A protein has these predicted regions:
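Conserved nucleotide-sensing/catalytic segment adjacent to the nucleotide-binding pocket
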Residues: 279, 284-377
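Short acidic, glycine/serine/threonine-rich loops at helix termini
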Residues: 137-143, 267-268, 313-317, 336
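Flexible loop/turn segments at secondary-structure boundaries
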Residues: 135, 213, 261-264, 274-276, ...
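Glycine-rich phosphate-binding P-loop
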Residues: 248-279
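Generic recognition of stable, solvent-exposed alpha-helical segments in well-folded globular domains
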Residues: 110, 211, 215-219, 261-265, ...
Length: 447
C-alpha cells in the first residue's frame, strides 16, 4: 500500500527516483503509530543515531518513553534551541535573507542531488501534512529517515497530518520538507542549517538538523509567508485570545511580536502569588515589587498561539481583521515553570494529557511521569533555557475552533531596561496606542 500510494503522488522526478531506491517507506496511519515510530519500536529508550563519514556513529538525539508521552533530548547543548542564523535561501528569487552560496562553498543543485542520494539509501517516513489550517491550508509532505519518528510526530502535532487511508491517489504537495541530519556534519561543520528553495509551484525546505524549531515550526511559517506573498495575504506572527469578562462582555485581542514579545503569555492563565496577588513588575534599580489585587478574572479562550492566518477568504467585510489558527498544535516553551505550582493550567495538561505528548529538553526516565519543571541541564547547575512541549490544540480546554474577528490589536517588543544612567530603546514603555493604519510601522521590527 505504502509503495503504491507514495509513487502515485505528484512529486519531483528526483524525489520519486529516491523513493523508488529507498528501503522501507512508511506512511503513518495514526498518531499512536507515530509515537511508536518515535521510539523505534516497543523499547522504552531509543537512540536516534547515524553513521557519518569520518566520524562513525553519531547519536543526534535520545528518546525515552514516559507515562505521559515521549521525552526527546539532544546530547549537544547547541542542538537544544534554534540557531537564529540557521536559515538560508537556495534559490535566486528576491530575498532579504542570506543565501546559501554566500555562506557555504556548495551549489544548491549539487546539494539537492546529494540529499536525494542519501534519502534513497534510507528507510523512510513519508508523511502528508497540512501547511496552514485544514480548510484553507496547502498540502505538504515530509520525507525523513524512519528513525526520526519523533520529528515526524512533532510536525504532525504542529500542523496536522493526513492518515495514509485518507490520502488521495493524486496527492500533489505544495511544499516538501526533506530531513537529512547527517549533512550537518558532512557539509556544514556541525551547524544548524535549513535551506528554502522556492518556486511558483513548490516550496522545498531542506532541514539538516533534528531540532524541529527551524523547520517543522519556523520552516512551515516561512512556507506560509512565501505562499501569502505570491497570493497577496499574510500569516501574522501573533497570538489571539477571546476574553470573556465576569460580566459576559467579549473582546478578542491579537498580539503580534517577535520571540519574547509576550505572545504565548496572552493565552495563559495569569500567575498568582501564594496570597492570590499578582506580581506586575520589579523595579530593577530599587528592587521594589509592584503587586496587583484582582479578585475577578476573565475567561480566556485561545484562538492562536503563534501563527494567525489572515486569509482573504476569512474576511467578513466589517473592516475588522478575521484570523484563524495556522497550526494544529503549539510549540510551548516552559522555561518559566521551575517548580510545582507555577502554572497549574499547563502542569495539569502536561502531567495528565488525553494522549501522550512530545517533550523536549526535559528530564525523563523510562516509565516515569515527565515533570515540566525538571529541565535538562546544559551544564551543572545551568538548566536549558528552552524546554518545550508540543501541545495539540484539541487538548486545550476552551480553545476556539474556527475564525475569530479581532477587536484590539497589540504589538509586543522585547527591550532592554531603560534608565537615566543607561538609556535605551526600552523607552517605548509598556503601552502605546496607535491607529490600525500605522500597524505596519511596528511590524517592521517583527521577524
Amino acid at each position: 500500500m505504502s509503495r503504491e500510494l507514495v509513487l502515485g503522488m505528484g512529486l519531483p522526478a528526483e524525489l520519486r527516483a529516491a523513493l523508488e531506491r529507498a528501503g522501507e517507506r512508511v506512511v503513518p496511519e495514526t498518531r499512536e503509530e507515530m509515537l511508536e515510530l518515535a521510539m523505534g519500536g516497543k523499547d522504552d529508550c531509543f537512540e536516534v543515531a547515524y553513521d557519518v563519514a569520518e566520524r562513525g556513529r553519531v547519536v543526534e538525539a535520545t528518546v525515552v518513553r514516559c507515562r505521559n508521552g515521549v521525552v526527546v533530548n539532544y546530547p549537544e547543548a547547541y542542538m537544544r534551541r534554534r540557531d537564529p542564523n540557521c536559515m538560508f535561501i537556495g534559490d535566486e528569487a528576491a530575498t532579504d535573507k542570506p543565501r546559501l552560496r554566500d555562506e557555504f562553498p556548495v551549489e544548491m543543485e549539487t546539494l539537492r542531488g546529494e540529499v536525494f542520494d542519501w534519502l534513497g539509501q534510507q528507510d523512510l517516513i513519508v508523511m502528508p501534512f497540512m501547511v496552514g489550517d485544514d480548510r484553507l491550508g496547502y498540502p505538504g509532505l515530509l520525507v525523513a529517515p524512519k528513525n526520526a519518528g519523533f520529528f515526524a510526530g512533532g510536525l504532525a502535532d504542529l500542523q496536522g497530518f493526513g492518515p495514509a487511508s485518507a490520502v488521495p491517489a493524486d496527492y500533489t504537495p505544495r511544499a516538501i520538507i526533506y530531513l537529512a541530519p547527517t549533512f550537518r556534519h558532512t557539509h556544514f561543520g556541525g551547524r544548524q542549517v535549513v535551506v528554502h528553495q522556492r518556486s511558483e509551484a513548490l516550496h522545498e525546505v531542506f532541514a539538516f538538523n533534528l531540532y524541529p524549531g527551524p523547520s517543522a515550526k519556523k520552516g512551515v511559517y516561512g512556507i506560509l509567508l512565501d505562499i501569502g506573498e505570491q497570493e497577496g495575504w499574510v500569516t501574522a506572527h501573533a497570538s489571539t485570545v477571546r476574553v470573556v469578562t465576569p460580566y459576559d462582555n467579549t473582546l478578542t485581542i491579537m498580539h503580534e511580536g517577535a520571540s519574547g514579545g509576550g505572545k504565548s503569555e496572552m493565552i495563559e492563565q495569569i500567575h498568582r502569588e501564594p496570597d492570590g496577588r499578582i506580581k506586575l513588575a520589579t523595579n530593577l534599580e530599587t528592587g521594589d515589587e509592584i503587586r496587583l489585587h484582582l479578585t475577578e478574572t476573565s475567561e480566556l479562550q485561545p484562538v492562536t498561539d503563534d501563527m494567525a492566518l489572515c486569509h482573504p477568504a476569512l474576511q467578513s467585510g466589517t473592516r475588522r481583521l478575521v484570523v484563524a489558527d495556522a497550526e494544529e498544535g503549539w510549540f510551548l516553551r516552559i522555561n518559566h515553570i521551575r517548580q510545582y505550582g507555577t502554572d497549574p493550567h499547563h502542569e495539569r495538561l502536561c502531567v495528565h494529557p488525553p494522549e501522550g505528548l512530545i517533550f523536549m529538553n526535559l528530564e525523563g526516565a523510562p516509565g516515569s511521569t515527565c515533570l515540566i519543571w525538571e529541565h535538562t541541564m546544559d551544564a551543572p547547575g545551568v538548566p536549558c533555557p528552552n524546554p518545550r512541549v508540543i501541545m495539540p490544540r484539541r487538548f486545550v480546554p476552551g480553545v476556539v475552533n474556527g475564525a475569530a474577528e479581532v477587536d484590539v490589536r497589540s504589538f509586543g517588543v522585547r527591550t532592554p531596561p531603560c534608565t537615566a544612567a543607561h538609556p535605551s530603546y526600552g523607552i517605548i514603555g509598556m503601552l502605546h496606542v496607535l491607529p490600525a493604519s500605522l500597524a505596519w510601522l511596528w511590524r517592521l521590527v517583527a521577524p
